[in-house]
A protein has these predicted regions:
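FIC/Doc superfamily catalytic core
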Residues: 1-348
């Protein structure tokens, strides 16, 4: 049986990359706190966009999809699920909403994790919702020629409940005693959770929901305004590579979790940087044309209307479209493609 001792982690010597990421995140979190005090109403516009993106991206990573219009309607609770994928999407929405509203009242225990998993599947008939796995699961890769390779074998079902209890106890102990930096403890906990793989289904999505919960409980609220799940989805190969590196030797307790820590901290810092970019556009009272011009300058290479919408949440679609037309006419942007495939890029 794998053992867990989070106190031992504090003896590890961290390289300058890890220490630099932690320092930068604290600096950005401090800036965010000031922005939230100064302009809370304007920043609320970012919350709904982040909810939609998080729900869409985290499910898409697992191949659970529907149209963008349906995602928006489901997240805004303006429609009911039509199929299994939409049932799973609605469940994710529900858990994310609970975390947003009540994170400080959700202790990190096996019981609460099981309850959140049950809510994740509350829109469908899943007899294993809210229960740890009943059969051995495997982390696999399927190759173009069709053959499947087992990359990692998680804990056996009979070991899972005790292991889940232990990582919760260890995490709560080192955080409660202030033994370990939260930005180290959080990725270590999430990595152990993914190695245990406690459920028959929903492990990846639960890991991302728990990441948000743990960050909120430690005062890092960036995920409320910028979707961490969308950032992971954009770089999911890096996510899986970091996870695979960190899993080597896990059963023997000799794993090197640093690649996963660096990946997760890098993702969190990138989200804070995005938050700052969007705040600059929200807080300055600009005309739509200038706001879209500045937003386009924040993009490298090709971008679409959705990219601008995310940076300019206060603008209507018609205002964005009008500004894009003017920038094209002025020779600042070039348009490519038609319909859903329309994209733009800067000419200077």
């Amino acid at each position: 049986m794998r053992t867990f001792n989070y106190s031992a982690i504090k003896e590890q010597k961290w390289d300058s990359d890890v220490l630099g990421l932690i320092a930068a995140i604290y600096k950005e979190a401090g800036k965010q706190e000031l922005y939230l005090k100064q302009r809370p109403e304007e920043l609320e516009k970012l919350v709904e966009i982040a909810k939609i993106q998080s729900t869409e991206a985290s499910n898409a990573i697992e191949g659970i999809v529907t149209t963008s219009t349906r995602i928006r309607q489901l997240v805004e609770e303006k429609t009911t699920p039509r199929n299994r994928d939409e049932q799973e999407i609605a469940g994710y929405r529900d858990v994310l909403s609970i975390i947003h509203e009540s994170f400080d009242a959700i202790p990190i225990t096996q019981n609460y994790i099981l309850q959140l998993h049950k809510i994740l599947y509350s829109h469908m008939n899943n007899p294993l919702a809210g229960r740890t796995k009943s059969v051995q699961n495997y982390i696999t890769a399927t190759y173009p020629d069709g053959h499947v390779e087992t990359l990692f074998t998680p804990l056996a079902p009979y070991e899972t409940p005790e292991a889940l209890d232990r990582i919760c106890e260890e995490y709560n102990r080192v955080i409660g005693n202030m033994e370990l930096e939260p930005l180290i403890a959080i990725p270590v906990f999430i990595h152990d959770f993914l190695c245990i793989h406690p459920f028959n289904d929903g492990n990846g999505r639960m890991s991302r929901l728990l990441t948000t919960l743990l960050l909120y409980r430690n005062g890092f609220y960036v995920g409320k305004y910028i979707s961490l799940e969308a950032k992971i989805a954009k770089n999911k190969d890096l996510y899986y590579d970091a996870l695979a590196q960190a899993q080597t030797g896990w059963h023997e307790g000799i794993e090197d979790v640093v690649p996963f820590i660096k990946y997760l901290l890098g993702t969190i810092l990138a989200a804070y940087k995005d938050f700052e970019d969007r705040v600059v556009l929200v807080e300055t009272k600009l005309h739509a044309l200038e706001m879209v011009r500045r937003a386009s300058k924040n993009r490298i290479g090709r971008f679409n209307k959705q990219d601008i919408r995310e940076l300019c949440p206060s603008l209507s679609d018609s205002s964005i479209e009008g500004a894009l037309r003017k920038l094209i006419a002025a020779g600042e942007l070039k348009k490519e493609g038609k319909g859903k495939n329309t994209c733009y890029f800067r000419l200077n």
